[in-house]
């Protein structure tokens, strides 16, 4: 059985070691082939590591980092001045081949800037993209990109995103011939701006893609397509809107019992059970695609269960050697296109 080594930034995020360390314990218990390199401040975390039995764990190694990237730090400042931060060190471990993947719940902008600087882009990749799996009514998952790495794109970049997203759907989600769609304001070919219509032509001409046309925002979670492609501005707005709706629904289901009728309490209980699959913890972890290494961004406010899922995602991508798969597919698609 092959092993996957994941470097975990235990200092990152709004909560930090009090959640990342227990998440590491959970991930190790769920995945026997997983090895972890925990990166953080040794003096601050040693008592916590000892408490959770990780100091002498056979599948755990600790690497000290003297700095931490704050959630409010500007990316350019973090890139230039925080070279011994836990975030930077996990990326260095991936670059050096000591880790197969890395996970951080830290500052998103800083992570993207550092990842591009340390790991570099794959050959032919203009811009890396953030991708995330989302739940659908079909019970399967849809992957969506870009979710905020690039606020503006051209048609060629969206084509690259589509190819990379299709590889993720195939290798990580196990979907044969994934259906690829562009997010648009309508399903008709005449709908959308010039960028979306031009991108649709490129995707339609790409024989390596199973392009099914446009999908509207209200169908993102329908399960009608397996890969949804958009620029980072649109994708981030769509994702944050969906997260807000889920939070609102959860709060309504948890409305104070004393203020609800008997039937209201029953309805709230049934709602929680029926829609438990919508729990964002199950889908935590957005991957930065198009780099020469695997980088998974956990939500900054993620707790241990969610962080554990981000670690498992990183290990799964490492198992499938995702960057190599993407590089091979891009070379095949774009070499044929240039002929």
Swiss-Prot record:
Gene Ontology terms, MF aspect: phosphate:acyl-[acyl carrier protein] acyltransferase activity
Superkingdom classification of source: Bacteria
Entry keywords, A to Z: Cytoplasm, Lipid biosynthesis, Lipid metabolism, Phospholipid biosynthesis, Phospholipid metabolism, Transferase
Catalytic activity, EC: 2.3.1.274
Subcellular localization, as worded in the UniProt entry: Cytoplasm
CC annotations in GO: cytoplasm
UniProt cross-references to InterPro entries, sorted A to Z: FA_synthesis (IPR003664), Phospholipid_synth_PlsX-like (IPR012281)
Residue stretches spanning the membrane: none
Pfam families xrefs: FA_synthesis
PANTHER family xrefs: FATTY ACID/PHOSPHOLIPID SYNTHESIS PROTEIN PLSX, PHOSPHATE ACYLTRANSFERASE
Quaternary structure and partners: Homodimer. Probably interacts with PlsY.
Protein name: Phosphate acyltransferase
Classification of source organism: Bacteria, Pseudomonadati, Pseudomonadota, Gammaproteobacteria, Aeromonadales
């Amino acid at each position: 059985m092959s092993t996957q080594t994941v470097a975990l930034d235990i200092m990152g995020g709004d909560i930090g070691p009090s959640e990342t360390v227990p998440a590491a314990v959970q991930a190790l218990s769920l995945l026997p082939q997983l090895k972890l390199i925990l990166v953080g401040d040794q003096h601050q975390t040693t008592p916590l590591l000892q408490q959770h039995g990780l100091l002498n764990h056979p599948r755990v190694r600790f690497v000290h980092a003297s700095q931490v990237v704050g959630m409010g730090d500007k990316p350019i400042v973090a890139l230039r001045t925080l070279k011994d931060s836990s975030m930077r060190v996990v990326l260095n471990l991936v670059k050096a081949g000591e880790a197969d993947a890395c996970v951080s719940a830290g500052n998103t902008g800083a992570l993207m800037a550092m990842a591009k600087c340390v790991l570099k882009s794959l050959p032919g990749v203009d811009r890396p993209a953030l991708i995330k799996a989302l739940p659908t009514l079909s019970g399967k998952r849809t992957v969506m990109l870009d979710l905020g790495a690039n606020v503006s794109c051209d048609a060629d970049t969206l084509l690259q995103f589509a190819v990379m997203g299709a590889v993720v759907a195939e290798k990580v989600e196990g979907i044969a011939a994934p259906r690829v769609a562009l997010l648009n304001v309508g399903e008709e070919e005449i709908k959308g701006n010039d960028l979306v219509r031009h991108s649709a032509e490129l995707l339609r001409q790409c024989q390596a893609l199973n392009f099914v046309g446009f999908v509207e925002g209200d169908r993102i979670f329908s399960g009608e397509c397996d890969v949804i492609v958009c620029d980072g501005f649109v994708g981030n707005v769509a994702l944050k809107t969906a997260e807000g709706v889920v939070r609102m629904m959860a709060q309504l289901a948890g409305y104070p019992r004393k203020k609800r009728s008997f039937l209201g309490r029953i309805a709230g209980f049934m709602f929680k059970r029926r829609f438990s699959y919508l729990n964002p913890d199950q889908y935590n972890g957005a991957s930065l695609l198009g780099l020469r290494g695997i980088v998974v961004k956990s939500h900054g406010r993620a707790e241990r269960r969610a962080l554990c899922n981000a670690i498992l995602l990183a290990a799964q991508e490492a198992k499938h050697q995702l960057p190599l798969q993407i590089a091979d597919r891009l070379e095949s698609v774009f070499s044929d296109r240039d002929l």
